[in-house]
Regions:
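Active-site-proximal beta-strand elements of phosphoester/diester hydrolases
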Residues: 206-210
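Conserved G/P- and acidic residue-centered "switch" motifs that form tight phosphate/ATP-binding loops
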Residues: 109
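N-terminal beta1-alpha1 cap of cysteine-dependent amidohydrolase-like domains
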Residues: 1-106, 117, 124, 128-161, ...
């Protein structure tokens, strides 16, 4: 059995006078490699997303800039710095396809917000101006400030992590607002900010607001990536078995 192939949604870098670049941070790549997967970049081409996901065993929706609030029917807050429109359309499409087709998906920071918006939910556009809290959620870099999160032990995330409370990094000024229908809150910060979501009807559709890829030596991060890759491995086996069942009688199995 080959290692599972996991696509990472790419960001777009625009510098004046230069050609645009599609990229992902290597911390995502290294985290997936350590967990036993083969990571690949998903280009920001939403018109090809439906065909591309057929080749993947899992999808990682990475962190980045803000989702355009027009997607959930709100005016743009002055602090909102929206991501490249090509990336936004691509990420939202990937989230919808993954949920519809049962493809294992892990959303990180912006990724969990995209999962919520794609399903019809909303975001808090700026925690600092909307929520009375002593927690600095928007510190940069992400490990400059940390806070505790409480995880619901009855959820997929709770079963992955075991501990009901643990400490995470934080680097986000936006957060989950109204939770979309069909999604479930899995973790919260002490101030009530949602720190995790999942679709309980999906084999693995899990998002976290913190950055486990920036916590490589911590057991919680290893557990999250390990569970994600294992779900992708199971999905790959199921695809392989389904393809074998459809093969003509007497046909040689594919390598």
């Amino acid at each position: 059995m080959h290692k599972p192939l996991i696509g990472i949604g790419s960001d777009v870098l625009q510098n004046e006078g230069e050609r645009d670049r599609a990229f992902v941070f290597t911390t995502y790549i290294e985290s997936l490699k350590r967990a036993g997967a083969v990571p690949v970049l998903i280009p920001p081409q939403p018109e090809n997303a439906a065909d591309l996901v057929e080749t993947l065993d899992g999808i990682l929706l990475a962190g980045g800039d803000d989702c355009d609030p027009a997607e959930y029917g709100e005016e743009k807050h002055p602090t909102c710095e929206t991501m490249d429109p090509r990336r936004q359309k691509n990420d939202l499409g990937l989230a919808k396809l993954a949920r519809e087709r049962g493809i294992p998906t892990l959303g990180i920071c912006l990724g969990v917000q995209v999962m919520n918006v794609a399903a019809g939910g909303t975001l808090i556009q700026d925690i600092g101006s909307a929520v009375d809290t002593d927690i600095d959620h928007a510190s940069e870099p992400s490990d400059r400030h940390r806070h505790d999160v409480h995880v619901d032990s009855s959820t997929t995330l709770g079963r992955i992590l075991g501990d009901q409370e643990f400490n995470v990094n934080s680097s986000h000024h936006q957060a989950i607002g109204r939770v979309a229908d069909g999604l479930r809150v899995t973790a919260k910060a002490p101030d009530g900010i949602v720190e995790g979501l999942e679709d309980p009807s999906h084999p693995f559709y899990v998002g976290v607001q913190w950055h486990p890829e920036d916590m490589p030596g911590e057991s919680s991060a290893s557990a999250i990536f390990g569970a994600f890759v294992e779900a992708a491995r199971k999905y790959a086996r199921e695809k392989q078995n389904a393809a074998a069942d459809l093969s003509p009688v007497g046909a040689a199995p594919s390598e």
